[in-house]
């Protein structure tokens, strides 16, 4: 069973990161309602806002309210206020790498490119 099953609203903690942005773009394009938060303004945040995504700066516990699923960056500390609030509310929380795998399963074929 996919962690996306039955989910409509997905909140991304650390949405300004280069690892989160492609996942956000794909899920937004697939019709999911996306919200996000980060600590700093930046080009990615501006682009997400231009896509119609609600982005909260800085992190705020109430930003996760209404989400069906929370995705967090590896850069997010375990005591992050949004992550803690999501757990209090019983909202499923997954790390970005798990969501990347889920997104790959949405397509019949995937290609991975890596390097240093």
What are these regions (language model features)?
Residues 1-99:
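N-terminal leader/targeting and accessory segments in enzymes
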Residues 12, 97, 101-116:
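Walker A (P-loop) phosphate-binding motif
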């Amino acid at each position: 069973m996919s962690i996306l099953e039955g989910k409509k609203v997905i909140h991304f903690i650390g949405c300004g990161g280069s690892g989160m942005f492609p996942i956000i773009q794909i899920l937004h394009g697939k019709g999911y309602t996306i919200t996000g938060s980060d600590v700093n303004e930046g080009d990615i945040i501006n682009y997400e806002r231009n896509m119609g995504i609600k982005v909260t700066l800085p992190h705020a516990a109430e930003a996760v309210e209404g989400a069906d699923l929370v995705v967090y960056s590896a850069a997010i500390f375990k005591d992050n206020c949004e992550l803690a609030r999501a757990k209090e509310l019983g909202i499923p929380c997954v790390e970005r790498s798990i969501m990347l795998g889920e997104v790959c399963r949405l397509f019949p074929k995937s290609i991975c490119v890596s390097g240093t």
